[in-house]
Design a protein with these regions (language model features):
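Extracytoplasmic copper-binding redox domains, predominantly the cupredoxin/blue-copper superfamily
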Residues: 2-136
């Protein structure tokens, strides 16, 4: 395949994924973590809500709260407080936002730009789930 066809295809895929997202990247370094994961959707806005990523012996972790509602333009911050194992905050589509696996002390802020419902999870703990509802 010619290089220009490949370039056009990559740009098209990028535009498609951008149009489908409900969050905007307004900060963060976008660098890969140790597993090769690249943080997506990280921002620096003042959060309207905060959720804590905490230990739970029954489920290997929890988001508290796990279901949150914000308005378009508002941000949510997740704070890692579990000293025992890493966790991620990852939209189910894997592209809207992804903190990658992080340890205690990490903070992740996402600003939501489109109304809708965005389910999210920890990529290695199936019982750690939540939903962000974004209203106009």
């Amino acid at each position: 395949m010619d290089w220009w066809k490949t370039a056009v295809m990559i740009v098209g895929i990028g535009l498609t994924l951008t149009a489908c997202g409900g969050a905007v990247a307004s900060g963060g370094n976008g660098s890969p973590d140790q597993s090769g994961c690249t943080v997506k959707g990280a921002g620096t806005a003042s959060p309207a809500l905060t959720s804590n990523v905490i230990p739970d012996p029954n489920t290997l972790g929890r988001f508290v709260p796990n279901n949150m509602t914000v308005k378009v333009g508002q941000a949510i911050e997740w704070n890692w407080q579990d000293p025992t194992v890493p966790h991620s905050v990852t939209s189910d589509d894997g592209t809207t936002f992804d903190s990658c696996l992080q340890n205690k002390g990490y903070k992740f802020i996402v600003t939501f730009t489109q109304a809708g419902s965005i389910p999210y999870r920890c990529t290695i703990h199936p019982s750690m789930v939540g939903t962000i509802t974004v209203t106009k």
